[in-house]
Each structure stands twice: as C-alpha cells, then as structure tokens.
From Swiss-Prot:
Compartment(s) where it occurs, according to its Swiss-Prot or TrEMBL record: Myelin membrane
Purpose of the protein: Is, with PLP, the most abundant protein component of the myelin membrane in the CNS. Has a role in both the formation and stabilization of this compact multilayer arrangement of bilayers. Each splice variant and charge isomer may have a specialized function in the assembly of an optimized, biochemically functional myelin membrane.
Residues with site note (Cleavage): 91-92, 115-116
Post-translational events: At least 5 charge isomers; C1 (the most cationic and least modified form), C2, C3, C4 and C8; are produced as a result of optional post-translational modifications, such as phosphorylation and methylation.
MF terms (GO), sorted A to Z: structural constituent of myelin sheath
Residues that bear Phosphoserine: 7, 12, 19, 40, 56, 76, 116, 163, 167
Phosphotyrosine: modified positions: 14, 69
Gene Ontology cellular component annotations, sorted alphabetically: myelin sheath; plasma membrane
Subunit structure, interactors included: Homodimer.
Main localization of the protein described in the UniProt heading: membrane
Name of the protein in question: Myelin basic protein
Entry superkingdom: Eukaryota
Sequence segments annotated as region (Disordered): 1-21, 45-116
Length: 172
C-alpha cells in the first residue's frame, strides 16, 4: 500500500484496502474455515466473517472493518497474544483428553511435561507468520497430535516396563 501511495495518490487507499481485504477474505477464510483455530484467527484478518461469532454485535463488526484496512500489519502483530490463545486452547482440547488414565502416573507426568514443551515450540510459528503459515501450521499441529500420541504410547510402554527398575529417566 505504501508503495502505491505516491503514484496513485487518488484511489490508493481504496485500492489497497480492497485488495488486502479480498485476499484476506477469499484467500484465507473459506478454505480453512472449518478448522476452528483459523476461525479465531480469521477474526483478525477477515474482520466481518469471524466477528459475529464472537458475540460482540454490530459495533465490533464495524470497528473491525473500519480499523481493519489501515492497520492490517499492526493488527496481526498486536494480536499475537490473542492469536496464540486459540492455538494453546486447540492443543489442550485435542491432547489432554487423550492422555492415558492416571494409573500410569509416572509416565503421564513425563509425557505431559514433554508435550507441553512441544506446544510451546509451536507458538512462535503461529504468532510470527500467522497469515502465511496458518494453513501449514494447523496441519502440522494436527499431525503433531498424532505423532505425540505415538510418542506418548511409546513413553507409556517404556514407563510400564521400567517401572520395576525406576523411571525411564533414571535408567538413562
């Protein structure tokens, strides 16, 4: 947008805002709308589509649309903490119910701490490249959940086998 300004002084604001809005709306939202995280991210980039879900009513809807065009970059940067919350939420929802029963307490503590570290590692990806990496990160995240399941079960088998001779950590 800033490059266009000197040469196309006239309609530059409209041109830039319309094009960015179109990209945000058509490029990002419809394709991944079903994922849930991206819905919440879509609130920041698509403005009108995600806001009504928020329950903020028409005022929020208009505010999002009006401030949306000029402050697209700042919005994504300032919104990073909020962007991360749905991601962490997503990991919590998808991963915690799958943790095995408390009977394997030893293994569970180990894997949970390990997994929370994994979730932490995901955060920067979502925060920094929010728009570009939405699609890839989400799928990576989903794959990560399955991988984690595999590693979790592996850790649990380890934990179960080694419980006689101390925890897996002690053995290493």
């Amino acid at each position: 947008a800033s490059q266009k300004r000197p040469s196309q002084r006239h309609g530059s604001k409209y041109l830039a805002s319309a094009s960015t809005m179109d990209h945000a709306r058509h490029g990002f939202l419809p394709r991944h709308r079903d994922t849930g995280i991206l819905d919440s991210l879509g609130r920041f980039f698509g403005g009108d589509r995600g806001v009504p879900k928020r329950g903020s009513g028409k005022d929020g809807h208009h505010a999002a649309r009006t401030t949306h065009y000029g402050s697209l970059p700042q919005k994504s940067r300032d919104g990073r903490p909020q962007d991360e919350n749905p991601v962490v939420h997503f990991f919590k929802i998808n991963v915690t119910p799958r943790t095995p029963p408390p009977s394997q307490g030893k293994g569970r503590g180990l894997s949970l701490s390990r997994f929370s570290w994994g979730a932490e590692g995901q955060k920067p990806g979502f925060g920094y490249g929010a728009r570009a990496s939405d699609y890839k990160s989400t799928h990576k995240g989903l794959k990560g959940v399955h991988d984690a399941q595999g590693t979790l079960s592996r850790i649990f088998k380890l934990g179960g086998r080694d419980s006689r001779s101390g925890s897996p950590m002690a053995r290493r």
